[in-house]
Amino acid sequence: MDKFVKLTGVAAPLPVVNIDTDMIIPKDYLKTIKRTGLGTGLFAEARYNEDGSPNPDFVLNKPAYQNAKILVAGDNFGCGSSREHAPWALLDFGIRCVISTSFADIFYNNCFKNGILPIVVSQEDLDKLMDDASRGSNAVLTIDLEALEITGPDGGSIKFEVDAFKRHCLLNGLDDIGLTLEKGRSIDNFEKATAASRPWA
């Protein structure tokens, strides 16, 4: 998993509440267990017209936001089913950070396990960030996970909080497998000691 230390990029505004995982990645795209290629299906029902052409009114299709790395969204982001394809699709598109006033628990935890930083802010701070994100190509935010700070295009900053363990994992690029591998020497020592004490096993 890629480390997340500091991210600077365009933030796209998505002022919609209760965005569920089916909206993030529709069920038609759940036939694969690969984490790549899902970016094309991200918000597919809103991004594409019925004939498959891009919907010019959807924010991620607008020229200023086609390479967005940050999403500023309404309350209760990631609700609905627990599909892990939702963070996979966001990451494959290029989104590394989602900012909202609240997240569904399963989606929130899945983000950390896949290298995405979900940030919870107050409604007042979200309003400011939504305004920043509405500036098109000038909507550049910097997310500093070490300093726990969001810096806007005008230099203003907002502090945020993240669980210390989850922060450690993102800063060091550790998913569940990476965390296990950190204990590799201890695991090897345990297996050798077990083999020596129980040679018949």
UniProtKB/Swiss-Prot annotation:
CDD domains: IPMI_Swivel (cd01577). It catalyses: (2R,3S)-3-isopropylmalate = (2S)-2-isopropylmalate. The keyword Amino-acid biosynthesis applies. Pathway: Amino-acid biosynthesis; L-leucine biosynthesis; L-leucine from 3-methyl-2-oxobutanoate: step 2/4. One of its GO terms (molecular function) is 3-isopropylmalate dehydratase activity. It comes from the Bacteria. It is an enzyme of class 4 (lyase). This is 3-isopropylmalate dehydratase small subunit. It comes from Sinorhizobium medicae (strain WSM419). The gene is leuD.
